């Protein structure tokens, strides 16, 4: 069966659900999908099981990899990524956040903000997300007085991480909305959330005129057709027949794009902001991996050593309790990749939690990098610093 062509009739935006494990992110994602499928006869409703679709997730009942679904409101087309909340999977949440223009923060009304709520807010801020909407979930399980306290607490947190004091808060039960899609009272919270997204989230300016760049999130092979790399186009446009370079981690190599798809539909051209799959000519699955980038030839090069300005999180923010010294070896997260690197300090003997400092980093493998790109620094399963590249050294 021939695939249909994606019709670009509404502005496209990437959003996602973030928040602590078990606060209801996947349930809300499913509730939105079911609600939108009722409004739009062409839309496919995805149940909770469809979104949480890896066997180990079903077994543990938690989301591990970021999952994408699509839906439409009256005004916009949304790609929605359901981000994992589980601590060991936060690196996949970073990949997901790297693809979002705005986020929906889920907080369970019966338990309030938890450590991961804070970590996700910090990561959202570091990944350049400017606006969030709070969804206070599990309203049916919480005492009304507690809900008021949680609301105040969450708004304080949201402000602390640089988001607006006027961030909308939507209250409801995602499980109720998912389970009773025909009941207007149950789905009212989803309706309010979607209206809020259309009105409060700004459509991002897309860098369509810059050279093409896509950070590879996943790679799979389609028998008889070749290898597909998926990810969000960061800048530029891509069409069938164009040459691209695969940059970072391994030797740079050229290939030609033989297909561009989004949500199983064919695209005339992929453009900045789209989550796409690109079919690549003559590339084996083993030749390309998550963390590399696909780019217009000659526009980005791989590097190992750079100077950066970083902010070290305090103990209260979930960071280190003790200082670090020259020779420190954490993981550096750029776009969709994480690489170990060694830190050198200039004119300083150590860096304390809470410090803003300039450091020099040498990574153990080369990755595609640009000046001003932001990154997160993690160690032992937690985010310890965030930074920005000031200058590429070699």
Swiss-Prot record:
Its main location: cytoplasm. GO terms for molecular function: GTP binding; GTPase activity; translation elongation factor activity. Its EC number is 3.6.5.3. Belongs to the TRAFAC class translation factor GTPase superfamily. Classic translation factor GTPase family. EF-Tu/EF-1A subfamily. Mg(2+) binds at residue 26. This is Elongation factor Tu. Keywords: Cytoplasm, Elongation factor, GTP-binding, Hydrolase, Magnesium, Metal-binding, Nucleotide-binding, Protein biosynthesis. Residues 61-65 are annotated as: G2.
């Amino acid at each position: 069966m021939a695939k249909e062509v994606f019709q670009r009739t509404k502005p496209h935006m990437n959003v996602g659900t973030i928040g602590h494990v078990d606060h209801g992110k996947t349930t809300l994602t499913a509730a939105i999908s079911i609600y939108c499928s009722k409004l739009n006869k062409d839309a496919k409703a995805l149940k909770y099981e469809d979104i949480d679709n890896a066997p180990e997730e079903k077994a543990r009942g938690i989301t591990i990899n970021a999952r994408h679904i699509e839906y439409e409101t009256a005004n916009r087309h949304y790609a929605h990524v359901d981000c994992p909340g589980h601590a060991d999977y936060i690196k996949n949440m970073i990949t997901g956040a790297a693809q979002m223009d705005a986020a929906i923060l889920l907080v369970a009304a019966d338990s309030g903000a938890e450590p991961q709520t804070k970590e996700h807010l910090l990561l959202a801020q570091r990944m350049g997300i400017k606006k969030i909407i709070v969804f206070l979930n599990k309203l049916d399980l919480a005492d009304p007085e507690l809900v008021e306290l949680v609301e105040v607490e969450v708004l304080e947190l949201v402000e602390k991480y640089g988001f607006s004091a006027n961030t909308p808060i939507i209250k409801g039960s995602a499980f109720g909305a998912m389970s009773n899609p025909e009941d207007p009272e149950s789905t009212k919270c989803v309706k309010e959330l979607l209206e809020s997204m259309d009105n409060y989230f700004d459509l991002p300016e897309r860098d369509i005129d810059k050279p093409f760049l896509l950070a590879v999130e996943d790679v799979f092979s389609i028998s008889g057709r070749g290898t597909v790399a998926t990810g969000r186009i960061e800048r530029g446009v891509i069409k069938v027949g164009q040459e691209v370079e695969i940059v970072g981690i391994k030797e740079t190599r050229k290939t030609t794009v033989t297909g561009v798809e989004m949500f199983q539909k064919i695209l005339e051209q992929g453009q900045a902001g789209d989550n796409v799959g690109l079919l690549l000519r003559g590339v084996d699955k083993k030749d390309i991996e998550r963390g590399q980038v696909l780019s217009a030839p000659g526009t980005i090069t791989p590097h190992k050593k750079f100077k950066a300005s970083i902010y070290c999180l305090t103990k209260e923010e979930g960071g280190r309790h003790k200082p670090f010294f020259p020779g420190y070896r954490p993981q550096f997260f750029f776009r969709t990749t994480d690489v170990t690197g060694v830190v050198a300090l200039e004119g300083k003997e150590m860096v304390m939690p809470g410090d803003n400092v300039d450091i020099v980093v040498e990574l153990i493998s080369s990755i595609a990098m640009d000046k001003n790109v932001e990154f997160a620094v993690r160690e032992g399963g937690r985010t310890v610093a965030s930074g920005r590249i000031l200058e590429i050294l070699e």
